[in-house]
């Protein structure tokens, strides 16, 4: 068996096209264009690339994009004050603060300062809690994008045995909640998990988000499983690889996401979807 590739790049492009059409329709109806504020503190190269991609995608769909590139020395107090301003700005529907933040700024304080109705990253405890209670509104972008990828396969998720490898607040934990909501029997694995191989070999659906190149051997993948590889790791020779050993996994899986071009584009597409949702549901 050779897996079908789940083309996140193409699916994300389709979403952006639909969003652009919706923005055009809003303008023609005399409605406001959605606005996204993107805040970057410091000069982390990877963060600069991510933020650049988000701003470009905003412009492509016709959103207003407001950029704040702040020096590493920017204080926590000043950042919270900026968030307060944007919370009160009626032209801004979404506020995104690129993580990680410098050591002197507490991530949780910043995340919780963003008003839940403008939390388009889906990180605020209110929005995570809504997902946990099965009434999601603004959902965490990467898991939301992954669910779109899984739906694109046409596979019925109800009753699937799913394994999530990684338990971060950004991907692993909300991913577990999304899969529960989709009717999966879900196991979350982390650094203390025993018998990881056994759990993965039994899984119909595997989502891996640990940030370690080739962490999951391809031969562990059950024949016919769906493999979602969230990892994006640059090797010394410059090659980008995922957390799963792709070549062997692709021989066992029924569907697999490539790296790059799988999950990454969907995270940004979901961010844009959340921004339009916030405009329509909360701010119109």
Swiss-Prot record:
GO molecular function annotation: methenyltetrahydrofolate cyclohydrolase activity; methylenetetrahydrofolate dehydrogenase (NADP+) activity
Lineage of origin: Bacteria, Pseudomonadati, Pseudomonadota, Gammaproteobacteria, Alteromonadales
Pfam families given in the database record: THF_DHG_CYH (PF00763), THF_DHG_CYH_C (PF02882)
Role description: Catalyzes the oxidation of 5,10-methylenetetrahydrofolate to 5,10-methenyltetrahydrofolate and then the hydrolysis of 5,10-methenyltetrahydrofolate to 10-formyltetrahydrofolate.
Residues that hold NADP(+) according to the record: 166-168, 232
Keyword line: Amino-acid biosynthesis, Histidine biosynthesis, Hydrolase, Methionine biosynthesis, Multifunctional enzyme, NADP, One-carbon metabolism, Oxidoreductase, Purine biosynthesis
HAMAP family, A to Z: THF_DHG_CYH
Family statement: Belongs to the tetrahydrofolate dehydrogenase/cyclohydrolase family.
Designated name of the protein: Bifunctional protein FolD
Complexes and interactors: Homodimer.
Gene Ontology CC annotations of this record: cytosol
GO biological process: one example: purine nucleotide biosynthetic process
Reactions performed catalytically: (6R)-5,10-methylene-5,6,7,8-tetrahydrofolate + NADP(+) = (6R)-5,10-methenyltetrahydrofolate + NADPH; (6R)-5,10-methenyltetrahydrofolate + H2O = (6R)-10-formyltetrahydrofolate + H(+)
Bilayer-crossing regions: none
EC code(s) of this entry: 1.5.1.5, 3.5.4.9
Gene this chain is encoded by: folD
Biological source species: Shewanella sp. (strain MR-7)
Matching InterPro entries: Aminoacid_DH-like_N_sf, NAD(P)-bd_dom_sf, THF_DH/CycHdrlase, THF_DH/CycHdrlase_cat_dom, THF_DH/CycHdrlase_CS, THF_DH/CycHdrlase_NAD-bd_dom
